Structure formats: structure tokens, C-alpha cells
């Protein structure tokens, strides 16, 4: 099967790009290595849709997503993505935390984000479940959260409805050039697919696939862990984080809490097999109970782990590649991809269609590493 655009990777980035291309009448083929769409970080993350705490280079994408896409996304996809724009509290309890949070808030505010520092008492007025340990916080009222599974599946289903084709269990192992341009995709099963453009959005695997045409995106794998609790009655809707990044999360629409953290267990995980550990979950729970003592008796019902494709400078590569015409990179999202995915899907489609992009991507070009 051939298509005008081949997308390698069936996570939310690939699905969002497929949706935007198919909506414009472009024939699209999405190849996903695992048996399930969105089987990687796209459906395993904490669901944050945040501007606060981001590298300034990512802000145009997330600000565009929040202003123009997230509020309408459920209607666009005919799927409830459970988007709540109820703000983001990033918590601190020490003078060092105050310094960290002030730096993040000042940086974001300088780029037009509505974020400010507040006292512990002000934070407790926003969220009365916070403990007295909270002495400071950054507050961004326009941040929020959504359901990663529903958003990913929403993009997938609507892309299919618009004519995009998906093949799962088709692991891409090689790209091939024709007359100097990336045109063919080779899979582990020996199948060869051809397209006018190739979008590489396969997470950490993108590094190995890109290397087959001489391109190196400096990335490493980082292991993240997530825990989910039993469902309880509604308590609060803000997205949460901390100055030390020891946990992040929110309460979902159906009542459970979802919290995540970096586990640090990469040396112990087997290749391709994320390792979940009670050690990491316990560490997260201690931090959560420090700030939210009322959650102490809520039961944890499940934990899981997933790999994050961490770029060397902590922001993604979203870029054409001058050395390999026809190749478009979308990788290295470093755990920040979900919130910006609506805008990323849009700009990837615009790159593939040779259109001007909705936001400036110059700071995210591949050639910044050269």
C-alpha cells in the first residue's frame, strides 16, 4: 500500500497528524510497531495540558493548542477527551522551592503566559485540600488536563473516518531514499511502503529509524511511572506539580487520581520492557501525602511504567531535514508531548503539505544539533 504521506508511529502525534492530513484530502498510511494504537507514552502519561514550567521554545505550540484547539477538541473528534481548564498549581515548601518556582513563573510570564507566584494561603484558597506544608506555589489559571487515552483514540477514530489507513503490528526498521529523497519505509516483516513524504513520530525508536538514512537525533530513554487510585467523590480539578518534580497529576472525571513521576529505574529495565516498581510508587505516595494528607487512605489500584524519548536539550525535534528531502521528524518530546499534540499534529500536516505553519518552529529544527 502506498500513500501521499506515510506516518511512522501510531501515538497521539502520529494520529493527530493523520487526522489533519486526512481532513485536507491527503492519503495517509500510519504504521505502528506494536499491536495497539497509542500503546506507548501517548496513553500512559499524566494528562497535563500546561504552559507553566515549559521551555520557552515549546510555548508557542502549547499556547496555540490551548487557545485554538483543546477547548473544541471533543467536538472536533466526536469523543469526550475530558478536557478541564481549571488551572495548574505547582507546589513548594522551602525557600529553594520558592526560588525554583519564581524562575519558572517569571520565564513563562515573560513569554505571555498568565502565571504568577502565590502564597501557601492563596494556594489553599484555590485548593483547600492542600496541607500547611505548602508555603508557595505558581498558579496558571489557563492550564488544565485531559484524558490521554480518549484524546489519542479520538484522533485515531476520526482520522480513520476521514480516510486514513492504519496498520498495527508493522514495525518499521528502515527508511530508503529514491533519487536522494526519503520515499520508502521497510518493515520487519519485509513489506515496503512508498510515499511522497514520511513523518517519523515513533518515540525513541525514531533515533534508530532515522539513522538508516544517516540522521542522528540525540535522544535517550527515561523511565516514567504512573499510579492510579480508586475512584472517590470529586475533590479538585486543578493539574498538580511540584518544584522538585517528585510527582504530578490530577483527579480524573470518573473520580480516580492519576499521578506520575520519573522512576530512575532505567538501569534495571530490560530493553523494550518498561519496569514498574513499588519503590517508585511509594516515593510518589510520600510526596503526595506531604502535600495532600486527605489522600492518605485512598487505595492505589494499579501502577504502570513507560518509556519517554528524552531529547538532549529537553525539547522536541519537529522539523524537515535538509539532508534528506521528504523526511519530517517529530520526536524527542521529553514527556511534554501530550499537551502540545493538537498543534503538533496541525503543523506536521502543514509541513507535509508545504504550507506555512501555524506557529514558528525554527527553535525546534533538527539542525540545531549540527
Segments from the language model and where they lie:
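Beta1/beta-strand and adjacent pyrophosphate-binding region of the FAD-binding site
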Residues: 1-13, 29
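Active-site lid/adjacent beta-loop-alpha segment flanking the redox-cofactor pocket in flavoenzymes
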Residues: 231-326
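Helical element adjacent to the flavin cofactor pocket in flavoenzyme catalytic cores
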Residues: 138-189, 193-196
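Glycine-rich FAD pyrophosphate-binding loop
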Residues: 22-42
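C-terminal catalytic lobe of FAD-dependent flavoproteins
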Residues: 289-370
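Central helical "cap/lid" subdomain
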Residues: 38, 191-236
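Dinucleotide-binding Rossmann-like beta1-alpha1 core, especially the glycine-rich loop
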Residues: 46-126, 246, 287-289
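Short beta-strand to alpha-helix junction loop
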Residues: 61, 90-100, 139-157, 273-280
Amino acid at each position: 500500500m502506498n500513500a501521499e504521506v506515510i506516518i511512522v508511529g501510531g501515538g497521539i502525534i502520529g494520529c493527530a497528524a493523520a487526522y489533519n492530513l486526512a481532513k485536507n484530502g491527503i492519503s495517509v498510511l500510519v504504521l505502528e510497531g506494536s499491536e495497539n494504537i497509542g500503546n506507548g507514552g501517548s496513553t500512559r502519561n499524566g494528562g497535563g495540558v500546561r504552559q507553566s514550567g515549559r521551555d520557552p521554545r515549546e510555548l508557542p505550540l502549547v499556547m496555540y493548542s490551548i487557545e485554538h484547539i483543546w477547548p473544541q477538541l471533543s467536538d472536533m473528534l466526536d469523543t469526550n477527551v475530558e478536557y478541564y481548564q481549571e488551572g495548574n498549581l505547582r507546589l513548594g515548601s522551602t525557600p529553594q522551592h520558592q526560588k525554583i518556582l519564581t524562575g519558572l513563573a517569571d520565564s513563562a510570564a515573560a513569554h505571555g503566559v498568565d502565571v504568577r507566584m502565590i502564597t501557601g494561603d492563596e494556594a489553599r484558597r484555590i485548593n483547600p485540600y492542600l496541607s500547611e506544608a505548602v508555603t508557595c506555589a505558581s498558579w496558571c489559571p489557563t492550564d488544565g488536563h485531559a484524558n490521554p487515552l480518549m484524546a489519542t483514540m479520538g484522533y485515531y477514530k476520526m482520522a480513520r473516518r476521514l480516510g486514513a489507513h492504519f496498520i498495527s503490528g508493522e514495525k518499521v526498521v528502515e527508511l530508503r531514499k529514491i533519487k536522494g529523497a526519503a520515499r520508502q519505509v521497510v518493515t520487519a516483516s519485509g513489506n515496503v511502503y512508498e510515499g511522497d513524504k514520511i513523518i517519523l513520530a515513533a518515540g525513541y525508536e525514531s533515533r534508530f529509524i532515522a539513522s538508516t538514512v544517516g540522521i542522528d537525533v540525540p535522544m535517550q530513554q527515561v523511565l516514567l511511572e504512573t499510579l492510579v487510585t480508586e475512584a472517590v467523590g470529586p475533590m479538585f480539578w486543578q493539574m498538580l506539580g511540584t518544584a522538585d518534580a517528585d510527582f504530578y497529576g490530577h483527579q480524573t472525571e470518573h473520580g480516580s487520581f492519576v499521578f506520575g513521576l520519573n522512576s530512575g529505574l532505567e538501569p534495571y529495565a530490560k530493553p523494550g520492557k518498561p519496569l514498574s516498581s513499588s519503590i517508585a510508587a511509594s516515593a510518589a505516595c510520600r510526596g503526595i501525602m506531604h502535600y495532600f494528607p486527605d489522600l492518605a487512605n485512598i487505595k492505589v489500584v494499579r501502577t504502570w511504567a513507560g518509556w519517554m524519548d528524552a531529547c538532549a536539550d529537553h525539547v522536541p525535534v519537529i522539523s524537515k531535514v535538509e539532508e534528506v528531502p521528504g523526511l519530517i521528524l517529530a520526536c524527542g518530546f521529553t514527556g511534554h508531548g501530550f499537551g502540545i499534540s493538537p498543534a503538533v499534529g496541525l503543523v506536521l500536516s502543514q509541513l507535509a503539505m508545504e504550507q506555512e505553519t501555524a506557529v514558528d518552529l525554527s527553535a525546534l529544527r533538527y539542525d540545531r544539533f549540527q
